[in-house]
Structures are given as structure tokens and as C-alpha cells.
Amino acid sequence: MTAEEMKVAENGAQSAPLPLEGVDISPKQDEGVLKVIKREGTGTETAMIGDRVFVHYTGWLLDGTKFDSSLDRKDKFSFDLGKGEVIKAWDIAVATMKVGEVCHITCKPEYAYGSAGSPPKIPPNATLVFEVELFEFKGEDLTEDEDGGIIRRIRTRGEGYARPNDGAMVEVALEGYYNDRLFDQRELCFEVGEGESLDLPCGLEEAIQRMEKGEHSIVYLKPSYAFGSVGKERFQIPPHAELRYEVHLKSFEKAKASWEMNSEEKLEQSNIVKERGTVYFKEGKYKQALLQYKKIVSWLEYESSFSGEEMQKVHALRLASHLNLAMCHLKLQAFSAAIESCNKALELDSNNEKGLFRRGEAHLAVNDFDLARADFQKVLQLYPSNKAAKTQLAVCQQRTRRQLAREKKLYANMFERLAEEEHKAKTEVAAGDHPTDAEMKGEPNNVAGNQAQVKTEA
């Protein structure tokens, strides 16, 4: 009997006491959760930890009193499986269900609401019976914008609550699949943030940072979080390909957070990261380089414990980081971000040649010719031998003239159309003033009348 049928059958009335029956599915085999399948589901797949599940349910006390039903609200109930959002019995039972399945679940108090109950409808130490129908389940969306680009399904839960942070050393075993074809199978030990150098998609690294030690998960990646519009020749992955990875996070060692490092460590790590960023940049891995330079900024931006000698090094590192960030943003065509990075650099050194020039390039890229020209002119004022600035200034002026010419032509065409429309309107008005044949026959009388009127007015 389905949940809908049960609702019709009971017709709002209190049922007879419900019997305790079913297969014991409690982890301890203590008969705390008993399950009876009323209708088999389809397929072989069941929901995994972290999946969002959608169900209809009705709940009764053992005396047959109904205390709750999603059917009465005509709205499916959803929750994240295995996250403690519902009573223990539900997390246990729904994990065993297939889509379309209907089952009865009997839950002892320790797997339901315990000695506290849930006043006013559920008394203390109550054994409950539920009928649950599973409609669908889907993996956990790990993307910030919830665009479905990184979906995780947890096969095996990990230990504890700690997760790898940026820069953590992780040990993983992974398998990559494209259309069920195994294209990558490796055991790796690497630093989070350097996955691209190992031909790992950025989305996979993001997923690893959400895993716990010992966790085994399936990760589904949309193209923008995988190998994008380029694909990966090494693995024979075409452009715009969706991928699936099986990942086992064996172990990890978290990187020190900024607040855990002293000033000497921050300087030392900043120099190491700067060199790493330079290597990535030269290899054309601009996103990876970007991550390295951002680390330096986060470590040094608001640090106040440096000595006078250290502050000179800090100033130089911060300036270089903002300039390098600007260059990465330019390469990635993120022009607003490039301008922001240049502004940060120019706050540290208002006459910096690279800061002014790169900001001018960003302004030019978005057709903000006045601001671009001002930046290039200042570069030439301070550094007259800068040939690149002279070239870009000429380009800026040329494009300004082209834009003015286009605007002039646009306005000329606009005025020409307006003039034509005005002339057409006048012509139509004039044509409408001509008398008809009928009016012409009565013209003498009209003229006489007009003359009389003129005399009267005179």
C-alpha cells in the first residue's frame, strides 16, 4: 500500500494498534529499527551519505494515532542523508531504499525522539511507525554558486571533522572516468593548490578540500570544473567533457594557517610561494599562479609584527604580489580584477611603472580610453624611455579616433533619419490640407463667407 493509499484508507480516523514487524536494519542489531518493504523500488542504486533525498511520509504512534504527514501538506519532505538532520532511524532506513520504494519503519525511542519526545504530539519514550516513499535523491552540490558543477556522493564516511585546507599535503587514490572509460588511475601525494601540475581538474581539488580522512567519494564534474573547452590530450579527453572521479582520501596534513605562523615563517613561505607562482606563470598556468600570489597577500596584508628590516621585505613582496596578480588577471581577461590589483599596488607605490602600465592595459581592454590614456601618459611622464607605453598610447589614441568617427557617423545617420521623418511628416500634413472635389464646388460661397467674416472682424 502506498502512502497515498494509506491516507485514503484511514480517511483521517485513528487506526488500530500497529504491530511490531520487519527486518532489523539497526547497526547494532538491537531491533531498534525494523523495516518492511510494501512496494519494491526500481534499479539497484541507493542514496549515499550527503545525498539530498525527497520523500513522502506518514507517522503514527503505536496506538495508531497519526501525528504527522507530508501528504497532508501536499509537499514532499527533503533532507541531507546521514547528516543528522532527521531522527537516527530515518538516516538508517532511507539509506537502504531505492527510488519508488515504499516501506514501513518501526523506530524504538532511542532511534526516534528518546526520553524527551517531541511535545505535544509525541510523548516521551515513544515507539513510532512511519510509512516512507522515496521519490528521488541527488548528490551534494559543492559549488559556491550551487550551479551543479561539482557533485559529491559519499560512499564511505571519513573520520572526524577536519578537512584539508589550501596548501595541505594530501595522499589520495583516484580513478577518473569519461563515459565509463577509465582514463586515470593513480595514487598521489601532493599539496592542495598544485593539482593542475599533476593534470588534476580544479573541481577535483575543491572536492578533496571538502573530504575527511578515510572518506571514499564519487565526484561528478561539469566541463568548467574539469578540463573545460580545451580538454586534456594526455588522457584523450575532448573539449567540454563531463567527468567522474572515484576518490579515496587516505591521509592529509593541514598547512599552517596564517595566525599559526610567526613573522619569520610568513616571510620564508611567501618567498617560496612567489617562486612557485613565477614557475606556474611561465608555464601559462595563470590560475595556479594566481592562487600562489593570493597566499602572499593573505599572509602579509595585515601583519603588524614585523621589524623595521622585515617591513622592507614585506613591502617588496606585497607590491610584487599585487603586480603579478594584475598580470595574471590580464592573461585571464579578468580586467576589473586586474584594475583592482593595480590600484592595490599603486597604494604601495603611486608611481610604479608596471602598476600604471598594467592598469592602462586593463582600461584599454574595456574601451575606457580616457583612463587608459591618462595611465600611459603618466608612465611616459615618469619613464620617457618606456617604448611599450608609447605604443599603447598611440593605440589608445587611434582607437579613440575610430570611436569618435563611429559616433559621428552614428549621430549623422540618426540626424539624417530624423530630418527625413520630419520632412515626411510635413509632406503628409501639407497633403492633408488640399480641398476635395466636393469642397471645390462650394468654394465661391466659402470665399464670400470668408470675406464677410474679414469685414466683420475688421
Curated annotation (Swiss-Prot):
The modification Phosphotyrosine is found at residue 220. The modification Phosphothreonine is found at residues 143, 436. Keywords: Acetylation, Cell projection, Chaperone, Cytoplasm, Cytoskeleton, Isomerase, Isopeptide bond, Methylation, Microtubule, Mitochondrion, Nucleus, Phosphoprotein, Repeat, Rotamase, TPR repeat, Ubl conjugation. It holds the Pfam family TPR_2. It comes from the Eukaryota. Residues 267-400 are annotated as: Interaction with tubulin. Residues 423-458 are annotated as: Disordered. SMART domains: TPR (SM00028). This is Peptidyl-prolyl cis-trans isomerase FKBP4.
